[in-house]
Amino acid sequence: MNQTTANAAALALVGALALQLAACGTAQQSAPGQASTQPEPVTLTMSWWGDDARTETYQQAIQAFEAKLQYITVETTYGTIADEDQTADVMQVDWTWLGHDDKSANQFVDLNEYSDVIDLEQFSQSALDACTVDGALLAVPMSVTGRIFYWNTRTFEQAGIDAPKTYEELLTAGNTFREVLGEEYYPLAMDAAARMNLMVSYLESTTGKAWVADRQLQYSADEIKTGLEFLQALEENHVMPTLAAQQTNGTLDQTPMWQNGQYAGTFAWDADAETYRSALKNASGFLVGDEIAFGGQANGGFSKVYLALAINSSCQHPKEAAILVNFLLNEDMGASIMGTACGLPDSVTGRAAATAAGLVNPLVVEANNRMMAFVDFPLDPTFESPALAAVPDGLYAAVLTACSNGELTTTQAAEQLAEGITAVLSGVAAE
C-alpha cells in the first residue's frame, strides 16, 4: 500500500472515529448540577514543510488527533522550508536547526520535562543524543538516515565479477569494467556531496577519529589531503568518473547512465533505495550493498536525524503539545497515518504501526538497518550548513569539483577545505 492509498483509508477511519467519539461525548455529558469533567478547550498551532503528500498525511493525522481529544484544536501552517512559521507551538525541524548553541536552547522546550507524556524509550538513544544540547532534549527524532552503497548486479555480472565488499575489490572492479565493458562503464558514480561523505567515511575508518568533535575539526590539511588522494585513486582506477565527466541535470537516478546500468553503483541515502531501484530499466539486479570498511580503526561514516518535532518555548500549552507529538510518532493511530511521510520512523512503536499499515518499503528498512549496524559516528550539525554543503556554490562542491577537474592540487584543495570548515565552525562557536 502506498502513502496516498493509505491516506484515503485513514480519512475514512478518522470520520468514523469522530462520529463514535461525538456520540460517546453526548452520552457522557454532565447531568444538571454536576461539575463538568471536560478539560478546558485548548488551541495549538503546528507548522511543517514538504510536498503535497506529506501535507495531506499531517492533516489526516491531526484530524484523527482532534477526533480523539476533542478539547484540543490544532491550527496548521505549511509551505517551504524557508518560510516555515517559527512561532508555531509544534514545529517540524531540520536537525541542523538545533545548532547546538544557546539560541536554539532558548527557542525550544526541554522535552525531558515531558517524558511522562512522550514515551522517549521508543526512540534510539543515539538519535535522542543528537537532539540533546547541554542536557536539554530540544526535539524528538522522527527518522534517522545515512548513506549506503547500492549496486546494479546485472552490470557486475556482465563484467564477470561480484559487487564489491572491500576497498581492494572496489579498485579491481574499476579496471575490470574498463577492460571488459569499456570506458563508459563505471562501478560507482556520485555527486560532490556524496563524495564528501565518502571521503569522511574513509578518513574516519583509517584514523578512528570523528570528523568534528566539540566544534573543532579533528583533521589537519595533510590528513584531509589523504582523503582527497583516496577520491583521486577512485577516479584514476576507473571506479568513478570525474565530476566534469559526470555533470548531469538533476539527480543521478534520472540519468540514462544509471537507468541503463553504465553507472553500476552509488553511495546514497537509505531512504532513496526505492528511488534508485525503480529508476533502473531492469531492476531485478538492484542490491542494497554492505558498507565498506576502508580501514581498521573504526567503522567510518555517520547517521543523522532526518527530521524532528520540537515544541516552541513560547507555547502556552506544552503538555498538550507533547501529547500531540506522542500521538504522531508513537501511538498506533497517529503513526499508522504518518507512515514514512517524514522518513522511516525511529520510534519502535511508530515503525511497527507504519509497517502494519503497509507503508514501509522493505528495501528502505534493509538499507537503514545495514547502515545503522555499521556506522560509528554521529553527524556534526555543521556538516550540512549551506556555506559548506550547498550545491553548486558550497565549499564542498566548489573544492571537490576543482580538484576532480585538475584545477586544484590535492594539497591546495585540502588547505581550502580545512580553512573553510574551520571558519564555519568558528562562527558557530562564537554564537
Can you name each region flagged by the protein language model?
Residues 10-105, 163, 336, 408, ...:
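Conserved N-terminal structural module of periplasmic/extracytoplasmic solute-binding proteins
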Residues 84-96, 184, 259-269:
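Alpha-to-beta junction loops
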Residues 289-290, 339-394, 430:
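Long, aromatic- and glycine/proline-rich binding clefts that accommodate carbohydrate-like moieties
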Residues 138-142, 147, 171-223, 232:
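Extracytoplasmic/periplasmic solute-binding protein
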Residues 216-246, 291:
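Glycine-centered hinge/linker elements that transmit conformational signals in sensory
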Residues 77-83, 168-172, 244-259:
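Short helix-initiation/N-cap motifs at beta->coil->alpha
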Residues 63, 67, 158, 236-239, ...:
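Extracytoplasmic/periplasmic substrate-recognition and gating elements
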Residues 96-147, 288-289:
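Hinge/lid segment of periplasmic solute-binding proteins
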